UniProtKB/Swiss-Prot annotation:
Protein name per UniProt: DNA-directed RNA polymerase I subunit RPA14
Coiled coil: none
GO cellular component, one term: nucleus
Organism whose genome encodes this protein: Saccharomyces cerevisiae (strain ATCC 204508 / S288c)
Note: Present with 3100 molecules/cell in log phase SD medium.
Primary gene name: RPA14
Compartment(s) of residence: Nucleus, Nucleolus
Sequence positions bearing Phosphoserine: S121
Functional description taken from the UniProt entry: DNA-dependent RNA polymerases catalyze the transcription of DNA into RNA using the four ribonucleoside triphosphates as substrates. Component of RNA polymerase I (Pol I) which synthesizes ribosomal RNA precursors. RPA14 seems to play a role in the stability of subunits RPO26 and RPA43. In vitro, the RPA14-RPA43 subcomplex binds single-stranded RNA.
Keyword entries, A-Z: DNA-directed RNA polymerase, Nucleus, Phosphoprotein, Ribosome biogenesis, Transcription
KW Glycoprotein (keyword) present: no
Location of region: Disordered: 100-137
Length: 137
């Protein structure tokens, strides 16, 4: 028998389930595009360094340690969250630079060829429906 209607489970604190408070102390100031690009670049570089350091720590970490699996799982979770956030920030950065979205050109282009099928006859059935007969190839 289930108690309550709320599912207990992975309740990690995120900005979606934790309140965020912003206190305005000054009048709003406009920021130039160059300042935004500088901030984004430094923020992305800092977070990529964190990802690199956590992956290097898990690779070269203590394998004999009993908590190695828990540490690896935590760093994997951090890595997944950061990498998805960084990809979104890189899209914003490209948008501020006025560049088109990044595309993966490593795959071979797909060529689609179409062939025309010729109808042989269109008839009306006794119940009023349309019957189309196609030529067999």
């Amino acid at each position: 028998m289930m108690k309550g209607s709320r599912r207990t489970g992975n309740n990690t604190a995120t900005t979606l389930n934790t309140p965020v408070v912003i206190h305005a102390t000054q009048l709003p100031q406009h920021v130039s595009t160059d300042e935004v690009l500088q901030f984004l670049e430094s923020f992305i570089d800092e977070k990529e360094n964190i990802i690199d350091s956590t992956t290097m720590n898990t690779i070269s970490g203590n394998a004999a340690d009993a908590d190695a699996a828990a540490v690896a799982n935590t760093s994997l979770n951090i890595d997944t969250n950061l990498s998805s956030s960084i990809s979104q920030l890189k899209r914003i950065q490209r948008d501020f630079k006025g560049l088109p979205p990044a595309q993966d050109f490593s795959a071979a282009p797909i060529q689609v060829s179409t062939t025309e099928k010729k109808e042989t006859s269109i008839g009306v059935s006794a119940t009023g429906g349309k019957k189309t007969t196609f030529a067999d190839e």
